[in-house]
UniProtKB/Swiss-Prot annotation:
Belongs to the class-II aminoacyl-tRNA synthetase family. HisZ subfamily. InterPro entries: aa-tRNA-synth_II/BPL/LPL, HisRS-like_core, HisRS/HisZ, HisZ. Heteromultimer composed of HisG and HisZ subunits. The keyword Transport does not apply. It comes from Thiobacillus denitrificans (strain ATCC 25259 / T1). One of its GO terms (biological process) is histidyl-tRNA aminoacylation. This is ATP phosphoribosyltransferase regulatory subunit. The gene is hisZ.
Length: 321
């Protein structure tokens, strides 16, 4: 076995990319500071129940675990910094005021998120706690776009969805947890036949609504189409109203709407979004609203935010030159 080989999907950052990555990190942190965000630096490891309780449970399969030699308790290497920032907001800052927090640091994944993608992303992000209004979502979206521009990333398209649409339909259908999860997987796979099978016993209006979700993808015309094709449930109407407001406020941004986009369904509670550049199949930045993120720590505060991987930004920024 060759001693210098690294594990699969784990790599060094070499010159000149290392300086480019560091320049982007500094530019983003300076931008966050200018916008009033406070920097926090959580630890690399924590007790597993802190990182994987509640909404953080979606990260379980991605998380490396080990036994603490001092306490004998199970610990975990963080796979995402957001649950840590939620803990800091809920337990350590201890105020009901709006908190604007930012962070950066390495995270570790047991599996890669995609072909040739690193299992050690260098995560950077910003979050707003304590503001349930759409203004906070707009602030976060604008900050993310400004951050991408500061890193030299051009040709950005935003894909936007709202998990409240699917959640409202699923509640109206009265699914048990297992069926709801199966339908979620079918929608993510765009498997129309599986969606038809799983919704076969529902009233026709709900069957048609679930079948329509994968087709509701495109420009702002999708929002009007959704109002026509989906049941007139209050939660669905509220979600679509939010998306219309975002569309009006982000008039100069290339937007695509995807009402079957349920990434982080167990984690997010409202708007979800991802930024793409031409020629790249995976997102270079992503985020959304996750109002229940602090419940396990005793304070379920409204929250919205985004994160990026500096490794991916270096590649995307280079491609824009």
């Amino acid at each position: 076995m060759t001693a210098w080989l690294l594990p699969e999907n784990v790599e060094d950052v070499l010159p000149p990319q290392a300086w480019r990555l560091e320049a982007m990190r500094r530019a983003l942190l300076d931008l966050f500071r200018e916008r009033g965000y406070q920097l926090v630096i959580p630890p690399l490891i924590e007790y597993v129940e802190s990182l994987l309780t509640g909404v953080g449970a979606d990260l379980d399969l991605k998380t490396f675990k080990l036994v603490d030699q001092l306490s004998g308790r199970l610990m975990a290497v963080r796979a995402d910094i957001t649950p840590q920032v939620a803990r800091i907001d809920a337990h350590l800052l201890g105020a009901n005021a709006i908190n604007r927090l930012c962070y950066t640091g390495s995270v570790l994944h047991t599996q890669s998120d995609g072909f040739h993608r690193s299992r050690e992303p260098i995560q950077i992000g910003a979050e707003v706690y304590g503001d349930a209004g759409i203004e906070a979502d707009l602030e976060i979206l604008s900050l993310m776009l400004q951050g991408l521009a500061a890193c030299g990333v051009e040709g950005v398209q935003l894909d936007v969805g709202h998990v409240g649409v699917y959640r409202a339909l699923a509640q109206e259908a009265g699914f048990d947890n297992a069926t709801e999860h199966e339908l979620f997987c079918a929608l993510q796979a765009k498997d129309a036949s599986a969606v038809d099978v799983l919704t076969a016993g529902l009233p026709m209006a709900l069957r048609d609504a679930f079948a329509a979700l994968p087709q509701l993808y495109g420009g702002r015309e999708v929002l009007a189409e959704a109002r026509a094709r989906l049941p007139h449930l209050p939660a669905v109407a509220a979600a679509l109203d939010t998306l219309v407001s975002l569309d009006q406020a982000l008039g100069g941004v290339e937007l695509a709407y995807d009402l079957a986009e349920l990434r982080g369904y167990g984690y997010h509670s409202g708007v979800v979004f991802a930024a793409y550049t031409r020629g790249r199949s995976h997102a270079i930045a992503q985020g959304g609203r996750y109002d229940e993120v602090g419940r396990v720590f005793g304070r379920a505060r409204p929250a919205t935010g985004f994160s990026m991987d500096l490794r991916e930004l270096v590649v995307a920024g280079s491609a824009s030159e």
